[in-house]
Curated annotation (Swiss-Prot):
SUBUNIT field: PSII is composed of 1 copy each of membrane proteins PsbA, PsbB, PsbC, PsbD, PsbE, PsbF, PsbH, PsbI, PsbJ, PsbK, PsbL, PsbM, PsbT, PsbY, PsbZ, Psb30/Ycf12, at least 3 peripheral proteins of the oxygen-evolving complex and a large number of cofactors. It forms dimeric complexes.
Places the protein is found: Plastid, Chloroplast thylakoid membrane
Family: Belongs to the PsbT family.
Protein name according to UniProt: Photosystem II reaction center protein T
InterPro entries: PSII_PsbT, PSII_PsbT_sf
Membrane topology, as annotated: Single-pass membrane protein
Entry keyword annotation includes Thylakoid: yes
Transmembrane segment boundaries: 3-23
Primary residence: plastid
Matching Pfam families: PsbT
Length: 35
């Protein structure tokens, strides 16, 4: 059970950092699809 909690926290932190970078400078690959 503890492993699940630690994994969830790790994924959550990585997700937040990923989102921060995403919004700071949007990737051009996705910009192509999302025009």
């Amino acid at each position: 059970m503890e492993a699940l909690v630690y994994t969830f926290l790790l994924v959550g932190t990585l997700g937040i950092i990923f989102f921060a970078i995403f919004f700071r400078e949007p990737p051009r690959i996705i910009a192509k699809t999302k025009k």
